[in-house]
């Protein structure tokens, strides 16, 4: 990992995968981006991670807009830790995955199904490959 010209720590793919898994375990919402016709659409979704892929649950309408298309999926998180003089510092992170979305059957996922927090999350499962995986970690100024 290295620091870019703006002071953000650039994360390597293994660290991005680790943070995606933490985000899923902590039920952080992800944001799915897809072009719906000529209009970009970004939706918050619960997700899970299976192997190196992202799994989301969607309804029929969105399903037809996603399957066999390139999409983007983004997750943000915050981590607090003890800093100098006992003050808690918070660093923030963001991971962006880009890849092909395909249908997946629940039977092939076992315990890796997304755990939705909404009453009607949809019944179709979509696998998003992490063909391109990038991330940044932002540290507090002066740390």
Identify the meaning behind each predicted range.
Residues 1-23:
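Extreme N-terminal tail/first-helix region
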Residues 2-9, 107, 127-129, 133-143:
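Short, charged, intrinsically disordered terminal tails
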Residues 21-30, 36-37, 79-92:
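Intrinsically disordered, low-complexity coil segments
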Residues 26-59:
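Short beta-strand segments
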Residues 49-51, 105, 134:
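A generic structural motif
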Residues 54, 101, 133:
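Short beta-strand segments in beta-sandwich/barrel cores
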Residues 56-58, 73, 135:
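Short hydrophobic/aromatic-rich beta-strand segments that constitute the beta-sheet cores
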Residues 60-124, 130:
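Short, structured beta-strand-loop surface elements
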